[in-house]
């Protein structure tokens, strides 16, 4: 493949003079390019919605969401995966981020790690890939061998696969059941896909993981009601969520949270129904953890 033909590798005619600009002009030029990202992502929303539904289906069937990529793309997957346990109270390992070259590549580039299709397959084998897992391949270029190898193995294993690329009709798109391709255009700095392409990928991952968790019962209204209150800031947030969801006072919210070990969902259910902590937990369990369903039935 001639990489110079990729949209993400071509020169941007709007930024040919970066080295001659004043600092205010320089950052304005970057910002002008960044405004294009949201519209590019908007054009992919039907495919993102399919990916959200696939991710939710994977979780409901006992599977995992597995991101895999190299360089910036891999780091973005690891970032999104690492935020899911504290935000949604899910176990570590339910959302997984794989980066070519292994964990060391998060901090320091591992040269050539992305060039092996076999490495992508091997990393999924090491995770004991199951057919109920969802595998999301991330590559701004859309042609990273590590990702191609992983997606190909995942499909052969019966998994649903998603490809996120910033070039149209990419090789990884052809390996996936669902292709998400926000075409953000040439980067302000030629070929530096940590810029617009990285931003677009982050926006897509935000929607996939958050949307899946909404459909997995981890959200009530727009509150992260399965959040783990593991520090002072989060204890305060837990109190505020109970107050905002129920209209009770803060002191009463704190009393209820102490009875639930600072679990927000049963505290809200207790406040709105009068149930005790044990009965609230039992009712939530009967509705697969969906707070709205527990309140309405």
From Swiss-Prot:
It comes from the Bacteria. PROSITE patterns: GCKR, SIS. One of its GO terms (molecular function) is carbohydrate derivative binding. It holds the Pfam family GKRP_SIS_N. Specifically catalyzes the cleavage of the D-lactyl ether substituent of MurNAc 6-phosphate, producing GlcNAc 6-phosphate and D-lactate. Together with AnmK, is also required for the utilization of anhydro-N-acetylmuramic acid (anhMurNAc) either imported from the medium or derived from its own cell wall murein, and thus plays a role in cell wall recycling. Induction: Induced by MurNAc 6-phosphate that releases the repressor MurR from the DNA. Repressed by MurR in the absence of MurNAc 6-phosphate. Residues 55-218 form the SIS domain. This is N-acetylmuramic acid 6-phosphate etherase. Homodimer. The keyword Lyase applies. It comes from Salmonella typhi. Its EC number is 4.2.1.126. The gene is murQ. It catalyses: N-acetyl-D-muramate 6-phosphate + H2O = N-acetyl-D-glucosamine 6-phosphate + (R)-lactate. Pathway: Amino-sugar metabolism; 1,6-anhydro-N-acetylmuramate degradation; Amino-sugar metabolism; N-acetylmuramate degradation; Cell wall biogenesis; peptidoglycan recycling. Keywords: Carbohydrate metabolism, Lyase.
